[in-house]
Each structure stands twice: as structure tokens, then as C-alpha cells.
């Protein structure tokens, strides 16, 4: 039987499995259960981390990776074109409200582009973003404080302070048309009141005539890889000839890192002991999984040793025997692994709210992770 017919080898492997279908069914179930165990474990672990990150993002007011602060138009274009930057979102703040009904939670009046609005949880769920004239969008909490019914086209009169905390010029009162709104998040640090770019430019020209410096424009960024966020942003500054230090001269572009990301916190406070503990934990998990799977195949192959010996006596080469066993392993994995991954993800997704309910955050902030690391684990 010293032939090179791979089709014959595959057929023999399949028929060998079918001949001992009860034992192999147990092997498939064992593989599926092992995959379920590790998949559900990693799903819960990564989902807890994702839930914590989302909770922090809501407290901060956004989930962009970081912000290049007070940039000019030329600097914004240069940063957006850098290969480490995947996407950018621009925001120009023209004023604020921090008295009266907004004394507890202040409001910021600003222009946000589509990316910035999405990353800041300020994209209208009803209506559309401000496009022209005196259109405005805000959250339902701000509308309630202003005594305005959420209705498209509603007229809203706002009195806000032009400028920012470092420079204030005068109060301005204007009547806006409500173009959209979104649900208020109790965790949000501010009320975002978004106006159109044309209105922001008009107020900026008015403020410049009154002697104010140009309004602050921040560039929020999403990086290609959310690892070592500060290091990557400093590299962008360095490559473009900017300094992130406040006393770096005229060409300063300061950096703000979103500390809601676990990778950002680890990058700044990582120590050798933490790294070694993490590596040891992963090695333990991988080794445990290896032992479980090894024992499954050991039991399966041991039961067929006599059969393989008979095949060898009639001319099957050691190489062909390895192929037969390899094909059996592939078939068993193909049957058990996808089932275990799907069931494990489902179990993990179902357990996440239960686990989160026993934390200080509660089940209401649970976010099920979809990280590819779950299946790779």
C-alpha cells in the first residue's frame, strides 16, 4: 500500500472515524466543551474590561484614542495625513454656560464634525447635525433644563459666554432652531450644545473684532493601533516637527491621552511584576488546554494502536499513518471547535451581565466584547 494517493488516505481517515463513531463523538464533545470553557472565560474577562472602558468613556465624554490640543488648520491637516492616524474629528469650542440651570452640569457650545460627534456620544438620534444658519443639537437633559419640548424645528433662545475659561469677552444671546437631539447620559461631564460650522465662524469673527484670541480647536484622533497611545502621539508630533511640552516654543501641539483605555493606563504604569504575572497566567491557561486536548487524542489513538499496527503490516508507511492520524485530528477539530466557540461566546455573553451586576458598576453598564482575541484564545 505504498502509494501517494492522498484521496485514499483521506477516505481511510474518514471511514476509520466513522467505524468508531461513539468514541469519536465523545472526543468531539470534549473538544467542544474545552473550547466552550476557554471561550466563555475570555469572553467574560474581555467583556468586563470593555464594560469598564465604556463606563469610563461616558464619564470622560468620549472614546477617541487621544486629542491634539489647540491646533491650527495646517497642523490639523498634517496630523490627519500621518500614517499612524486612522481617523480624525475636529471640535471648535466657542462658548459655555455654567450658571443658572447649568450650574451643576455645565454646557459647552461648539462645532463638532461627524467623527467628533460620534466619538463624543453627541450624534443626534433624532434629526440631523447642524448644517447651516442657527441650527442646534443637544441632549434631552439640556432641553429639559431649558424647558423645551424635544421637537424638530423648535425655537430655543440661549444666552452663553463667548470664549473659554482662559478668556471671556461677553455674553451673547441668540435664538436657534432645534435640528436634532440624543438621550442624555447621567454620567456625562457636560452638556454638549452643537452648532453649525458657519455659525461658529461668524461668532469667531465677531470675537476677533472684540479683541479675543482665536477659538480653541482640538483634533481628536483614532490611531491605527490602540497600543502605547501616548508614545504613538508623541511620535506623530516628533515626525511633524512639533513639541508636546508647554514650553517647547511656538510650534507646540499638546497631547491628551484618553485614559479610559486599558492599554493607555498599562502603557504608563506597567511594571515587570505585572507583565510576568500576566505571561505566567496565559502560559498556565495554554498549558492546561494543551493537556486536556492531548489526553483526548491520546485516549483516541491508544484505542486504535492495534488497528494501525495491522495497517502497517499490509504496507502502510509511517508517513501515511501520520497523515491518517492528522486527518482524523482535523476532522475532529472541525466538528468540535466551531461548536465550542459559538456556545462559549453565547455562555460568556450571558454571564457578563450577571458578573457585572455583582460589581460597583452594575449590570446596566455591561458591554459584551467582540475582540478577535476571544477566538484566538
Regions found by a protein language model. Give the residues of each.
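Juxtamembrane interface helices immediately C-terminal to a transmembrane segment
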Residues: 13, 17, 36, 40, ...
